Amino acid sequence: MALVSQARSLGKYFLLFDNLLVVLGFFVVFPLISIRFVDQLGWAALVVGLALGLRQLVQQGLGIFGGAIADRFGAKPMIVTGMLMRAAGFALMAMADEPWILWLACALSGLGGTLFDPPRTALVIKLTRPHERGRFYSLLMMQDSAGAVIGALIGSWLLQYDFHFVCWTGAAIFVLAAGWNAWLLPAYRISTVRAPMKEGLMRVLRDRRFVTYVLTLTGYYMLAVQVMLMLPIVVNELAGSPAAVKWMYAIEAALSLTLLYPLARWSEKRFSLEQRLMAGLLIMTLSLFPIGMITHLQTLFMFICFFYMGSILAEPARETLGASLADSRARGSYMGFSRLGLALGGALGYTGGGWMYDTGKTLDMPELPWFLLGIIGLITLAGLYWQFNRRRIESAMLSSS
């Protein structure tokens, strides 16, 4: 038992460093894409939104297949291959002077994520015990926030010189991450049985409760991805400089590093996962409604702060809830499918957000996209409430019988 505990402990440290590299490499590049192509080159927000949505759709929409392959062949080969593929996508992005090149680069980056993301998520479940999983997710989120602000700072600084440097730096970090995994990651099996890929896929698709939960989260992700598209654009417009975007990520990092872990420990003793997820989503939704009417940068940052507070409350609960519903016989497949809501929400959030932003500008109604996003948040909240309430009723009926 002592050896098992030691292996779990070392595995968690490995996951934390690996996660830092992945987050850093991603945020060096992606927050700057909308600034580079919309603000600097004058491309339509819809064109850039399509590129970002394509990356999201490819990575998360095909995640169930990446997870099923990892269930069959193990985590290590999929993680290393996927990270090298993302590095290639970032290198191609440096040459993007036509929309189709940007779309191709984002698709290649997303395909890499399809391969490495589900097995990495499944390893978290494998190496953590259920009672500590929520707090470990909080640590990962704190690291995500710190990596995001450091990555955005590096990317903003490099963008002053050349966008090529931004992309090459992101690619180099993912090559480093691939080497780290190839050298040190043991040949873990992420599921308790090594079943054919089709069996893992069908096991997930037959789990109606899990499928409903994942698809309901589409609306949640439509709100969440605006951190990468519309919020940076609005911050840049009000500030008059892309350098101000880094302060948006600095707010997230400061809130996450100071509040995320203690808030997770406090709330897990007092509220259910479902209550924490819905409360966080409600805060995120209400904070988006007024953004289109804001004319001062300080006020905008205040509402972005509220948005992040909602995310800090909701995210650990969302991850832990999804992990608790996963079948240990097909962890990779479950974690891959769990990203489908992010795929749909990301694709709709990016493309729809870009279209709504352009339409709002054309109609001289800057509040339009934010109002529509708020409505989507309320509809999602109602869907989650119905789903969780029905589950409680079914559990009560089973226990009484």
UniProtKB/Swiss-Prot annotation:
Subcellular location(s) per record: Cell inner membrane
The protein's name: Multidrug resistance protein MdtH
Keywords assigned by UniProt, alphabetized: Cell inner membrane, Cell membrane, Membrane, Transmembrane, Transmembrane helix, Transport
TM region positions: 13-33, 34-54, 99-116, 139-159, 165-185, 214-234, 243-263, 277-297, 299-319, 340-360, 368-388
MF (Gene Ontology): transmembrane transporter activity
Membrane topology value: Multi-pass membrane protein
Record's GO cellular component terms: plasma membrane
Family: Belongs to the major facilitator superfamily. DHA1 family. MdtH (TC 2.A.1.2.21) subfamily.
Gene: mdtH
PROSITE patterns (alphabetical): MFS
